[in-house]
Amino acid sequence: MKTFSAKAHEVKRDWLLVDADGKILGRFATQIASRLRGKHKPEYTPHTDTGDYIVIINASKIKVTGNKFEDKMYHHHTGYVGNLKSIAFKDLQAKKPEEIINKVVKGMLPKGPLGRDMFRKMKVFAGSEHTHGAQQPQVLDI
């Protein structure tokens, strides 16, 4: 008997709708990353993108434990000398709440072309409205 290896064009991908309201950021992101990779499917193949499309709503209502709401900082470098920029979690949540989930989930996916393809299948929205109604996403409770 041969080992099964899924082909990317043969994989059936579902559209899932996930509500982030009141969820804890890290625990929520691990579930999303696992679904994006396709690890919940029996035909999971590590070198092939077998994951589902995921639409996340209410990103602005995500929670963190402990003092991270006040203390957690996100850093990025502009590329110029001495330009390391920092922003606090609470400020980033007020300005761009989608970016928080994007950063966390992207860090949990494989690095390289395969991980970038997986990341593109995640759509994050700050409010409860989304633009993917035509895909008829199924509600997933995490």
Curated annotation (Swiss-Prot):
* InterPro entries, per database record: Ribosomal_uL13, Ribosomal_uL13_bac-type, Ribosomal_uL13_CS, Ribosomal_uL13_sf
Q: Name one GO biological process term.
A: translation
Q: Does the keyword Magnesium apply?
A: no
Keywords assigned by UniProt?
Ribonucleoprotein, Ribosomal protein
| UniProt-recorded Gene Ontology molecular function terms | mRNA binding; structural constituent of ribosome
Entry GO CC: cytosolic large ribosomal subunit
Q: Which residues cross the membrane?
A: none
Pfam families per record: Ribosomal_L13 (PF00572)
* Self-association state and partner proteins as the record states: Part of the 50S ribosomal subunit.
Task: State what this protein does.
Answer: This protein is one of the early assembly proteins of the 50S ribosomal subunit, although it is not seen to bind rRNA by itself. It is important during the early stages of 50S assembly.
Record-stated family: Belongs to the universal ribosomal protein uL13 family.
- Its name, as the record gives it, is Large ribosomal subunit protein uL13
Q: Which organism is it from?
A: Ruthia magnifica subsp. Calyptogena magnifica
Kindly list the organism's lineage. Bacteria, Pseudomonadati, Pseudomonadota, Gammaproteobacteria, Candidatus Pseudothioglobaceae
